[in-house]
Amino acid sequence: MITLLSPSKKLNFKHQDAVSAFTQCDFIESAQELINQAKNLTSQDLKDLMKISDSLANLNKERFNNWSLPFNQDNAKQAILAFDGGVYSGLQAETFDQNDLEFAQDHLRILSGLYGVLKPLDLIQPYRLEMGTKFENAKGKNLYDFWSNEVTNNLNKNIKKHENKTIINCSSNEYFNVINQKNLEGDILNTVFKEYRDGELKFISFNAKKAVSYTHLTLPTTEY
């Protein structure tokens, strides 16, 4: 069983957590290809492409310019600890022990516009490149064209290692759409988190992102 998450726009690179284990992204060379192209864009190009403010465009221009290999714990951070949005606040990965981290490493994947698909302990450097960005590249007109085959094949390779071949989709449509579902060798379970309010079930975005269920889906104490 594998659970899929979207990345977070909010990042935390201000301090390093006490986790020494790390891995490298499976598609670091492909990420480098996108970075090389992104480095040729101006701040105005990024503003127009990503529909972001001047300050964010300048920040991400700086991030792209500073992005460099090889990754190590001095210049990068594990993905599960670097992402800091609502989902990851609810996940509370900073509290994971060694067994929890190992289980998450096998059962959790994070879809990414820059890195394709990440294991929790994969090192990343700061970036912003959403999957839905219409970023033309050598493979097509957007990031779906760039990543679809690689991400789908990677998930198929990993799900074959599991007895339970269910893929639990907790990612957004923007990210899940990168997967070629017709070629996916696993059963897909889509999730929607709602709350009972005022006599009916409602989708509350902030609380849904912090759903404790994410923790239940990734820790080895979970009963399937």
Residue ranges and their predicted role:
Residues A93-L217:
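Internal, well-folded beta-alpha domain core
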